[in-house]
Amino acid sequence: MSSRAHPVDGSPATDGGHVPMKPSPTRHKVGIPPKQNMFKDFMYTFKETFFHDDPLRDFKDQPKSKQFMLGLQSVFPVFDWGRNYTFKKFRGDLISGLTIASLCIPQDIGYAKLANLDPKYGLYSSFVPPLVYACMGSSRDIAIGPVAVVSLLLGTLLRAEIDPNTSPDEYLRLAFTATFFAGITEAALGFFRLGFLIDFLSHAAVVGFMGGAAITIALQQLKGFLGIKKFTKKTDIISVLESVFKAAHHGWNWQTILIGASFLTFLLTSKIIGKKSKKLFWVPAIAPLISVIVSTFFVYITRADKQGVQIVKHLDQGINPSSFHLIYFTGDNLAKGIRIGVVAGMVALTEAVAIGRTFAAMKDYQIDGNKEMVALGMMNVVGSMSSCYVATGSFSRSAVNFMAGCQTAVSNIIMSIVVLLTLLFLTPLFKYTPNAILAAIIINAVIPLIDIQAAILIFKVDKLDFIACIGAFFGVIFVSVEIGLLIAVSISFAKILLQVTRPRTAVLGNIPRTSVYRNIQQYPEATMVPGVLTIRVDSAIYFSNSNYVRERIQRWLHEEEEKVKAASLPRIQFLIIEMSPVTDIDTSGIHALEDLYKSLQKRDIQLILANPGPLVIGKLHLSHFADMLGQDNIYLTVADAVEACCPKLSNEV
């Protein structure tokens, strides 16, 4: 607890004889910013909100030809970094491109199954979108393609509208429609510079959602891993486990389990080897492809498919056919496609931007978030017209891409070429690939999404964040992916509303032998001047919190008056509000200050404001509250305010 100063010989002193250090004899008045007309004020706010990075700064004072080239480079960064591209960079991109291709091919086949689509659509989605991104994206390290979480989310949302088994053609059309509008959503957010909207999904909520989705995805793989033919369509953990145990007596296939368990052990071992030595990064990257080749050959020579081992069977050969004519632009399915596309697009965008920023920070370069959104959006728009479903940045592939020494987005082009060759010549070889291998590959891929260390850190740092994390996690695994996402968004919004409507306030005291005033709970040695109560408001004061701020200040005052009365100290005569953290105030906030001022007047307590910012002091003058309060009751610092109050204090108890 802080100590309270006691008056000695009529002058305010503190325990131990401490007297607050006097500020400079020159007392500065609080500056009032020059008046701006409404249009200029609006344009300034608009610019700071949407164009704070001044995207046109490079275009200033440049000739038309230079501006055209800068504009072209802005939309297609390939024209920027492509000018300085060298064979040395190509060598790094070639190695990383071949490495991520070996990882993506088996993953794509499995991820397409998560979305309830034919495996070929997974390969299609790693051919066209990476080519578009390579031309328009600003990240050097991100690897594009289908990902587990988005595939599961898309499959769950689509299945809720159309059964893929009874109406496969309509289901496919809705998938392309959702992909188209996912791209439109992403591109629109970037074009209109609304990227800050994805920040409403907090890091804690994303950690919980991803962890829950990873467990859900792993549980879904038990169908292929155990060789179960009849499996629930639901994704919650109770329904899945119930389906698994019901099939235990007659539905499990021991050959399938043996294949899946053996290669999952191999994949996990390769991952451990890769972590132990950075030089062996290629081991876990190439392990999935080795698993597919070996298991496919084993099933082919033993004809294990005749013993109940489920295989991929037919995989169409050839490149992506056009699908523009399959997209719904009218009818009931249009609204469904828009709704699913917006949700899938936002989740895909959140994951991709987070991955891009992570690896950009590692290599000390910047990515333009809004340009990234446009690039990601355009690749999905083009993808939807070429038989692709929602693609985004893959963390596992991007990590391998980074470790392999990629230099530019050319690594995505190399990967696309390898996928193209696979589609043209190698797809028949996947006929005997066992589903258990695809299940093992997906389980191995989603394990890193369960970030226990991050959850522990969130719990230690912020309990409210942890509630968002755990709420999203349990929502996904016990109900459904979309409910988990809804919980994640809802709790994130609730936290924002709570912080806005219930801002923190603090009682300030003087740090001994200084003119500095700080929170008495943070600095127990800080002392309070008798007869003066100093309170800091740590937020802008708006209609949403103005009543709370006024009531909280009055409660601080009431509590302090009770302490003063019990200790027979001079009563509170001055209430100082430290306003430096108050960045803005609206009419409701000003009205709350007026009510507080009138209430204090009735109790013979003078209200004083210290260090209001330019926006705040300007509005206080425009509303005439500054005149009501009196110019001599507005000070530049708390120390100035306390110094002015001290001679006016009486010893009245």
UniProtKB/Swiss-Prot annotation:
According to UniProt, the tissues expressing it are described as: Expressed in lateral root cap, root hairs, epidermal and cortical cells of roots.
Does the entry feature the keyword ATP-binding, yes or no? Answer: no
Q: How does it sit in the membrane?
A: Multi-pass membrane protein
Task: Give the record's GO CC terms.
Answer: plasma membrane
CDD domains to which the protein is assigned, alphabetical: STAS_SulP_like_sulfate_transporter
GO-annotated biological processes: cellular response to sulfate starvation
> Which regions face the Extracellular side of the membrane?
113-116, 163-173, 216-253, 302-339, 394-409, 460-466
Signal peptide coordinates: none
Task: Kindly list the GO molecular function terms attached to this UniProt entry.
Answer: secondary active sulfate transmembrane transporter activity; symporter activity
Chain's role:
High-affinity H(+)/sulfate cotransporter that mediates the uptake of the environmental sulfate by plant roots. Plays a central role in the regulation of sulfate assimilation. Unable to transport molybdate.
- Name of the protein in its database record: Sulfate transporter 1.2
**Which organism is the protein's source?**
Arabidopsis thaliana
